[in-house]
UniProtKB/Swiss-Prot annotation:
One GO cellular component term noted in the UniProt record for this chain: cytosol
Keyword Aminoacyl-tRNA synthetase: no
InterPro entries, alphabetized: Integrase-like_N, TACO1_YebC-like_2nd/3rd_dom, TACO1_YebC_N, Transcrip_reg_TACO1-like, Transcrip_reg_TACO1-like_dom3, YebC-like
Principal location: cytoplasm
Protein known as: Probable transcriptional regulatory protein PCC8801_2028
Family: Belongs to the TACO1 family.
Organism: Rippkaea orientalis (strain PCC 8801 / RF-1) (Cyanothece sp. (strain PCC 8801))
Localization per record: Cytoplasm
GO biological process, one term: regulation of DNA-templated transcription
Length: 255
């Protein structure tokens, strides 16, 4: 919608100004541990692990830390018996905005308590499993950065089995996001790379089926503070919400 920022745009704008620049070293390391535990501890044969390693390297995590995380996931790192669980939490923000939280935790009681406190202090509430997840579909999303020839992108998207794509141009950032089914993410990523597109990220993302417009300054401020509080928790890997915010309110609250 013209004049409003979708959730993906909101995330990009926030990360440009957040001191933590998105995910912390600990969060990225945990993603590597879980990926190595779920599949082969070799990135050449484990797409989830390969993607997690690429994100870690982009964030500046040293190779030594990456190798240690892989070893922990494979169970070959001495004196470490920590077991992380992947858990999805659900809740509501101010004005009934639906929020999904993906966490990696070694203590689900601690994580639930931290999330409940963050919600309650900022006008939301942590809900039961299933209360909002029906409002989202999980998709594979590939980020392309830089100038994009739309005709070439359309051709590559069809060849790779993409569902759709969206071009974006924000401030000095231009590029595209390409969407596909979860099971097709690796194939499409490879196709786009072979076609010489500048693929910088491939991830699984929850996409809202419909979005709520936020035009009230106080609601916008409260929502963004809640998102910040949730993202700052060590156990939280990703936060997704189903609101769009008026661009002038977005700039006023992230500047």
């Amino acid at each position: 919608m013209a004049g409003h920022s979708k959730w993906a745009n909101i995330k990009r704008q926030k990360e440009r100004v957040d001191a933590k620049k998105g995910k912390t070293f600990a969060q990225l390391s945990r993603a590597i541990i879980v990926a190595a535990r779920h599949g082969l501890p070799d990135p050449t044969g484990n797409f989830q692990l390969r993607t997690a390693i690429e994100k870690a390297k982009a964030a500046g995590i040293p190779n030594e830390n990456i190798e240690r995380a892989i070893a922990k996931g494979a169970g070959t790192y001495e004196n470490d018996d920590t077991i992380y669980e992947e858990i999805r939490y659900e809740g509501y923000g101010p004005g009934g905005v639906a929020i999904l939280i993906e966490a990696l935790t070694d203590n689900r009681n601690r994580t639930a308590a931290d999330l409940r406190a963050a919600f309650s202090k900022r006008g939301g509430n942590l809900g039961e499993t299933g209360c909002v997840s029906w409002m989202f579909d999980q998709k594979g999303v590939i980020l392309i950065e830089g100038e994009v020839n739309e005709d070439r992108l359309l051709e590559a998207s069809v060849e790779g089995g993409a569902d759709s794509y969206e071009l974006f141009s924000e401030d000095e950032e231009i590029g595209a996001e390409v969407f596909t089914e979860v099971t097709n993410l690796e194939r499409l990523t490879q196709t786009l790379k072979e076609k010489q597109f500048n693929v910088t990220e491939a991830e699984l993302r929850w996409i809202p089926n419909n979005r709520m417009d936020v035009n009230d300054p106080e609601q916008a401020r409260s929502l963004l503070k809640l998102i910040d509080a949730l993202e700052s928790l060590d156990d939280v890997q990703n936060v997704t919400a189903n609101f769009e915010i008026a661009e002038e309110l977005m700039m006023a609250n992230v500047a």
